Structure formats: C-alpha cells, structure tokens
Design a protein with these regions (language model features):
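Active-site microenvironment for binding and transforming phosphate-containing groups
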Residues: 1-257
C-alpha cells in the first residue's frame, strides 16, 4: 500500500522489510538537476533531495542518480563503485546500505524492487519507451547476474504514474506496441482501449507493467500497485503542465545500517 505523508508517499510493504521506497509530491519541490524550472535558483534541486533524505533519516546516504534518456539500461552499484552520477542510465540496483538510489518522473512509471532472499534493492524508470524496451526484464536479468535474484523472491512496487484515462496516444504508438508484443496478446488487449468520444487510443502503462511482471515470474501477492494519478495537481505532470513541469523522485534505500 502506498501511504501518503505531507511531502511524499511511501510503500508500506517495503517499509516492513526495512526499505524506504518513496515517491515525492509536488510540494517537496523539483528533484531533478537536468530539469531546471523557470526562476529556480541553482542548487535548489540538490537542496530538495537533501531535505527529503533528512526527513527520511537518510542524510548520511550517498545519492546515486542519472541523466535519464528513456533507455533500458540498469546500472549495478556495488562495493567497487566510485561513480555516483551517470548518463543514459534509467535504473539502478544495489545491495549497498550506504547509498540512496534516485530516479526522476513527471508521469512515467517507477518500478521499485526488493530481493527478499539476497537483500538487494532497485528502482527503474519506465515511461512508455522503457516499457517498450522492457526495462523490467533487463533489470531482473541484471539482478540475477549480480545477486542471483529469482523473480519469485522479488517484492515489486509499481507507481506513482499517469493513469490510462489521461494517457492518450496515437495510432502509430499502438501499432508499434502491437507489432512487437502481438495484437492479440494479453499485454496489448489489456493495456490499450479506445476512447469512444475521441476515437483515440489510451495506454495503461501500469497495467502493461503489471502483466509484464507476472509473465516474468513475479508473484501477484508480491506486487504493490498505486492507484494514484500524476495528473492530479499534487504531482508533477509533463502531460498536464508541459515543459514547465518539474520532476518528482522515486527513491529507494535501506533504512538502517
């Protein structure tokens, strides 16, 4: 369950395992260095991230982040890692207790993961390009290689992202997905619907990733899915606000060490 606090939501099921998995609200401020907002002073985003870490009692953590470019690239942060700022990386995994993994959003879908057997965590940025490129599949493969992760041991959180009612897409968008995954597949049939008033397709990125997770071996009882919608004014939304939108963070870290 996603529990709302003043400045963020946290996932209760992750908290029960000693994992902070949070999604920041708009009133926590813009979190992304690569998305400067008009009139915002330099360094504001870093201050906002530090303030969030302080609020979560995680101020000692080393922040890890990337200039995200809608890839399916997932980076391992291990004991030999000395670089913490990346480019062209859209997800991280780690078993280190001294880092906080940051990813950034304004409608795209965060995928939070915790390997309950091997004590490893991750967070992956899955907008429609990440979903199309199957970042979830790649992330699980990276975890298997790094930690011996098995899907049945994964606790996974999906959200917070934009809901289908506000996610209108073009015919080419639909055709590209249908060609890759199969027009009659469960993935496509359950993830797209036509708005009867406009005749336009609407995409359900959350359902797409839920079905993908099940196909990849995640147990349904280990899936935690948010019903919140980033179209709501309490979140940043690129579709609602356009280029002036800031970015939320989806951050994951171990609680104590």
């Amino acid at each position: 369950m996603f529990i709302e606090k003043e400045n963020y939501f946290y996932i209760e099921e992750f908290e029960n395992y000693g994992i902070k998995a949070v999604y920041s609200k708009k009133n926590a401020g813009n979190m992304s260095d690569y998305c400067g907002m008009e009139g915002q002073k330099e360094g504001t985003q870093e201050k906002n991230r530090n303030k969030l870490l302080e609020e979560l009692n995680l101020r000692a953590r080393i922040p890890v982040m990337s200039f995200q470019t809608h890839t399916n690239n997932v980076q391992i942060i291990d004991k030999n890692t000395e670089e913490y700022i990346y480019r062209e990386i859209d997800g991280f995994v780690t078993d280190r207790k001294d880092v906080a993994l940051f990813t950034f959003y304004a409608d795209c879908l965060p995928i939070f993961v915790y390997d309950k057997e091997n004590k490893a965590i991750g967070v992956w940025h899955s907008g429609w390009p990440g979903s199309f490129k199957e970042i979830m599949k790649n992330g699980l493969e990276v975890m298997k290689e790094a930690f011996g992760t098995k899907p049945e041991n994964i606790l996974m959180g999906l959200g917070i992202g934009i809901q289908q009612e506000n996610y209108e897409v073009g015919n080419d968008f639909y055709e590209n997905f249908a060609e890759k995954f199969g027009k009659e597949s469960e993935l496509i049939k359950q993830s797209f619907k036509i708005n009867e008033k406009t005749g336009k397709y609407h995409f359900d990125n959350i359902t797409f990733n839920r079905i993908m997770a099940l196909k990849l071996g995640i147990k349904e009882e280990n899936l935690v899915i948010s019903q919140e919608n980033t179209w709501n004014e309490k979140f940043y939304s690129h579709r609602r606000e356009g280029k002036k939108s800031g970015r939320a963070t989806a951050m994951i870290s171990f609680n104590g060490f």
